[in-house]
Amino acid sequence: MKSSVCVLLKVLACILLPGGLNAQKESNDDIQHYTADDCQVTPVIHVLQYPGCVPKPIPSFACIGRCASYIQVSGSKIWQMERSCMCCQESGEREASVSLFCPKAKNGEKKFKKVSTKAPLECMCRPCTGIEDANVIPQELAAFADDGSLAGYFQKSQFKAAE
């Protein structure tokens, strides 16, 4: 179950946080936010495939987890938003060579094919790819009403938590 955790900044902002109640609260003078970083190297079974060869399951590793992200109104330019998008990614990788049995090899070709595979060495929360400004809808187009007060700039979320 995903839950939304809303916090009061100098202005109101809402952060979708998949960590729910397991999130840890951090704060400084200007902002309160929640982190739920849990990015780890996890053992998996990876099936290596190559045309004409028998698929071979091998033990491997993957980066699995979640990282804290947020969006908030800029402290210096209230008409702009500040974003921090963090993703669970590899930091270093290992490489291995594995032999696959290829029973359908043509005459003159080897029955075993050596293939290379990679796996993460370590995992950490790192910045995701950036959001292009062209994909951000201005507040005026997103139906935010300007009634002269700060409260008029914010509407209740249209999103419902998944159950």
Swiss-Prot record:
Chief place where the protein resides: secreted
Any GO molecular function: BMP binding
Alphabetical UniProt keywords: Disulfide bond, Hormone, Secreted, Signal
InterPro entries xrefs: Cys_knot_C (IPR006207), Cystine-knot_cytokine (IPR029034), DAN (IPR004133)
Cell compartments where the protein resides: Secreted
Disulfide bonds, paired cysteine numbers: C39-C88, C53-C102, C63-C123, C67-C125, C85-C128
CTCK domain: residues covered: 39-129
GO terms for biological process, alphabetical: animal organ morphogenesis; chitin-based cuticle sclerotization; cuticle pigmentation; sequestering of BMP from receptor via BMP binding
Signal peptide annotation: 1-23
Claim: Disulfide bond is one of the keywords in the record: yes
Highest taxon, organism lineage: Eukaryota
GO cellular component: extracellular region; extracellular space
UniProt key word Chloroplast: no
Subunit and partners: Heterodimer of burs and pburs.
Anything else known: The bursicon gene is encoded by two loci: burs124 contains exons 1, 2 and 4, and burs3 contains exon 3. Exon 3 is trans-spliced into position in the mature transcript. This unusual gene arrangement has existed for at least the 150 million years (MY) of mosquito evolution since the split of the culicid and anophelid family lineages, but is younger than the 250 MY split of the dipteran suborders Nematocera and Brachycera (containing the Culicidea and Drosophilidae, respectively).
Function statement: Final heterodimeric neurohormone released at the end of the molting cycle, involved in the sclerotization (tanning) of the insect cuticle, melanization and wing spreading.
Name this protein carries in UniProt: Bursicon
Organism field: Aedes aegypti
